[in-house]
């Protein structure tokens, strides 16, 4: 059984460190949230393949949706 986590503020310093630890421990990432850093969120989504990605800034959410069209996120 794989443990699963969700990370709020994944593009910030603590969120990035948490993702590093999750990767080292082999944890599955179910969800990522961020405010507006679309480039970093896209990279995280492509790497960790969460089921859900949420951006609080509406224009960032729209941009992320376009960028991730080729993924199941």
Residue map of PLM features:
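N-terminal Rossmann-like dinucleotide-binding module
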Residues: 1-53
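Conserved N-terminal Rossmann-fold NAD(P) cofactor-binding segment
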Residues: 39-73
